[in-house]
Amino acid sequence: MAQLAGQPVVILPEGTQRYVGRDAQRLNILAARIVAETIRTTLGPKGMDKMLVDSLGDIVITNDGATILDEMDIQHPAAKMMVEVAKTQDKEAGDGTTTAVVIAGELLKKAEELLDQNIHPSIIIKGYALAAEKAQEILEGIAKEVSPDDVETLKKAAVTSITGKAAEEEREYLAEIAVEAVRQVAEKVGDKYKVDLDNIKFEKKEGASVHETQLIRGVVIDKEVVHPGMPKRVENAKIALINDALEVKETETDAEIRITSPEQLQAFLEQEERMLREMVDKIKEVGANVVFVQKGIDDLAQHYLAKYGIMAVRRVKKSDMEKLAKATGAKIVTNVRDLTPEDLGEAELVEQRKVAGENMIFVEGCKNPKAVTILIRGGTEHVVDEVERALEDAVKVVKDIVEDGKILPAGGAPEIELAIKLDEYAKEVGGKEQLAIEAFAEALKVIPRTLAENAGLDPVETLVKVIAAHKEKGPTIGVDVFEGEPADMMEKGVIAPLRVPKQAIKSASEAAIMILRIDDVIAASKLEKDKEDKGGSNDFGSDLD
């Protein structure tokens, strides 16, 4: 409602909530900080897990920031921006999702303190933008170059990523799998390497222990051989991939065939059989002894394939067909009649095996496969899911290093270095922006402080010790949460890709700046149905309760 010459003017529908100026900023900052506080306790190797139960009673137990925020049904728009920070970090860097959200929350906390001192949001925004830009430059300066062939360093980065997750006991073993998988599918483009993570397939099966998790240099497909008479094991396999059905197709036109005698019916059936026989003969003729079909296989075609000793699998997913092509070197053929010996792929072994009581097809021993499978095992569904999340993060971290060739110490070391250097930079900038840059630097200390806090250490005492050691010994000094003392993270093998902190600071600062720009929130009243679903409230601020 507005007033013009003493007359109230209604421009928004009834029930609309509006928050202006400091109220709007305070509300948004509070919402974003609540999200950051929620996942702060999961940060680091000693971080705790969260148990999330959805409306159907399904349970997720994890300490992965992106997963936690994805599973939470967050309503507040400013809080949703924090979820986007985690999603962007996960997509771009693969790890550091909790770090990014915690930094964003702390930046907003420090911004609120500046707002309380009557510093204009525009000045804070400018200072934060300058600090974020300078931070990228500082990180580039302290990064160490590493070769994609340095397996030990890649493994250390993978171990750092897995530490603190449910799969921690097997971190060395899982790190080896992650490194081997990425190096196998990496392709050289010019003088750089590119890794397409779509070429690494994750298959999960409950049962056995996490140590039974294995890397298959080929593809594992959750299907079974279509006919009991077919071989279940084929060595020196010649593999055909058919993107069609081994069936007699129905015509597209609504034609009718009038059959007036038994002879005509017999001829019709014989022709159908002949067509199916020709398809199978073609597969045999080109030398294939294993065939994967994206669609169905007629019963008669199955019979002939079994008779010829050809293993066949039907209704294979398109994504699996593409992985089979990359692993075996086969070409996907649309029509069986176009199949040639050159289209066939090769594998040392194709075998149907029972895993956790279910049949699966293993295609192994491919020559230099550009698609691999990680078969994940674990005692329960929750363990298997968390091992998958840990491996996905580890694989992404290794990918970052292989592609960029640069690493940093972890354990809060980069954030401490940034805090020290940005404090110096703030003095060069001067003006009111100096206050914002100093606030940015102070906000970054939340990472080493939280790492210490989550490990049961005194956060203030630990931070003072680490900063003193860092200034004395250099930018690789961070928080050793196991010993409770400052330590050289590079020597300890606690490392991360350069891409992770760079993206975390970029995403966090952009989100904080976006939230600080908002000085007016107009929230329409919810529809009646939504009100019932949400318990009848249409108060925008009530989403924070």
Swiss-Prot record:
<dbReference type="GO" id="GO:0005524">
    <property type="term" value="F:ATP binding"/>
</dbReference>
<dbReference type="InterPro" id="IPR017998">
    <property type="entry name" value="Chaperone_TCP-1"/>
</dbReference>
<comment type="subunit">
    <text>Forms an oligomeric complex of eight-membered rings.</text>
</comment>
<dbReference type="InterPro" id="IPR027410">
    <property type="entry name" value="TCP-1-like_intermed_sf"/>
</dbReference>
<keyword id="KW-0346">Stress response</keyword>
<dbReference type="GO" id="GO:0140662">
    <property type="term" value="F:ATP-dependent protein folding chaperone"/>
</dbReference>
<dbReference type="InterPro" id="IPR027413">
    <property type="entry name" value="GROEL-like_equatorial_sf"/>
</dbReference>
<protein>
    <recommendedName>
        <fullName>Thermosome subunit</fullName>
    </recommendedName>
</protein>
<dbReference type="InterPro" id="IPR027409">
    <property type="entry name" value="GroEL-like_apical_dom_sf"/>
</dbReference>
<dbReference type="Pfam" id="PF00118">
    <property type="entry name" value="Cpn60_TCP1"/>
</dbReference>
<dbReference type="InterPro" id="IPR012714">
    <property type="entry name" value="Thermosome_arc"/>
</dbReference>
<dbReference type="InterPro" id="IPR054827">
    <property type="entry name" value="thermosome_alpha"/>
</dbReference>
<dbReference type="GO" id="GO:0051082">
    <property type="term" value="F:unfolded protein binding"/>
</dbReference>
<keyword id="KW-0547">Nucleotide-binding</keyword>
<comment type="function">
    <text>Molecular chaperone; binds unfolded polypeptides in vitro, and has a weak ATPase activity.</text>
</comment>
<comment type="similarity">
    <text>Belongs to the TCP-1 chaperonin family.</text>
</comment>
<keyword id="KW-0143">Chaperone</keyword>
<dbReference type="InterPro" id="IPR053374">
    <property type="entry name" value="TCP-1_chaperonin"/>
</dbReference>
<dbReference type="InterPro" id="IPR002423">
    <property type="entry name" value="Cpn60/GroEL/TCP-1"/>
</dbReference>
<dbReference type="InterPro" id="IPR002194">
    <property type="entry name" value="Chaperonin_TCP-1_CS"/>
</dbReference>
<keyword id="KW-0067">ATP-binding</keyword>
<dbReference type="GO" id="GO:0016887">
    <property type="term" value="F:ATP hydrolysis activity"/>
</dbReference>
